[in-house]
Amino acid sequence: MPCTTILVGKNASYDGSTLVARNEDSSNGVFEPKRMRVVHPDEQPRVYTSVLSHLTVELPDNPMRYTSVPDVVPGHGIWAEAGFNELNVGMSATETLTTNERVRGADPLVDYVPAKGKEGEDGYVPAQPGGLGEEDMVTLVLPYAKSARDGVRILGDLLERYGTYENNGIAFSDVDEIWWLETIGGHHWIAKRVPDDAYVTMPNQLGIDSFDLDDAEGAQADHMCSADLRAWMAEWHLDLTPGVEGDGPATVFNPREAFGSHSDSDHVYNTPRAWYMQRCLNPSDVWDGPDADFTPESDDIPWSRVPERKVTIEDIKYVLSSHYQGTEYDCYGSKGTPATRGAYRPIGINRNSQLAVLQLRPYAQPAYRAVQWMAFGSNSFNALVPLYANVETMPEYYADTQARVTSENFYWANRLIGALADVRFHECGRAVEDYQEKVGGMGHKQIHDVDAAVAALPEAEVPAELARANEAFAERVRVETDALLGKVLYTTSCAMKNSFAMNDNVR
């Protein structure tokens, strides 16, 4: 999916948490309804078949409970996207990536090939299943991962065995580490540990810009990869490091150069998003003018950086909601020209489906350590709400999304707010910001209060209390969301083209 990701190491976050956040965006012209769900071990398949690629995978018989954010409309798979399992391991999948022709030739993607002819007749060729995709990955990995590294290992094994039909980036987290895995061609992959003191920005483009093969093949302190990566790169002359003798590759090389893309479309769709996110978190750099360190179309924007100050939940929400505020590229702004204001793809876009921020707090007990912050609809107009992940059920307000449009659940209420507020952006802006700040403040207080309330409880009683707290908070969010919907509906209604000032029925 055309998503945007930010990862924050524990020493770069405001409270020592590991933070994994990703927008799930639908394709252009598609708006995919989403909902929250808790998947129990008896609901997890033991034999899984992908809808899109027709791949069948046998799964272990010991899955853990996990949270997910699946699609509502059936017919094209689960698309579980993001969640935590019982061991407080988080996974977010996937960020669709780009690659280049050399990689496509060296290790072709594993596409589904339909059957030809009729079975039993001459010339019949049976269908060939494709590999793994975004549809499948959380379902196949998260219920079994015992740590972030273990998640990398499980997915890596699956990729080497079954392959993939698309290029993807996947994040894994636990309370100590975040790992980022990028698929390379059909069967190869690399993974890198996010530095504890840094953040990572990821648009839809292969991102890792430095990789240590010796570490990946040895201690794996910060790097992991598919078993034959070095030999495969040498055979296909994929390393572009200057000065490397023979077939290479160099011990330390740049995967973005070797495996990635630098296309014209990247410069309007991908690099501007990384540029703006890093502009927000490292504002002292020069971002504008002829002496800029990086421009919106730079190909060398770093994969990871140390922020100028610690990164908060609100910082993450802001950058993942952004439309280039304060620049000539803001689609709602007055700077620049009509051409510049539509030049680059916003991060907060009309087709944001959901935003999941996975927070693992080292100071909280394991029974209530994991908090999954959620928002639905276009991020420029929605608010993040926290949910404790160690629960058996999710509140109906977040879980009962249907294909039918209604204001009775969080997904559709936010979709309606976004569509109404967009057309009167400046008139609705104050009400939207007030809502975002109020709900955000309510969320932080909710976590503080519930932490204190469950701290002395026996561990077995904690999940039920967390579920009650999630439900009570959802009802408060419903009240605030309904109020905002009423405000933006009123504002937009007053500005309708067919309005007329004269009336004859004054109450």
What are these regions (language model features)?
Residues 324-325, 329-456:
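Substrate-recognition/cap regions that form aromatic- and gly/pro-loop-enriched pockets
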Residues 60-66, 152, 334-342:
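Short Pro/Gly-enriched beta-strand edge/turn motifs at strand-loop
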Residues 231-368:
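Glycine-rich, aromatic-lined ligand/substrate-binding cores of catalytic
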Residues 144-150:
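Short, charged, surface-exposed loops that flank catalytic or proteolytic processing sites
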Residues 21-35, 96, 181-183, 319-330, ...:
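Soluble extracytoplasmic regions of secretory-pathway and membrane proteins
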Residues 2-134, 154-289, 293:
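A contiguous strand-loop segment
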Residues 138-144:
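Short, well-ordered beta-strand elements within core beta-sheets of diverse protein domains
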Residues 436-507:
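Histidine-centered catalytic/metal-binding microenvironments
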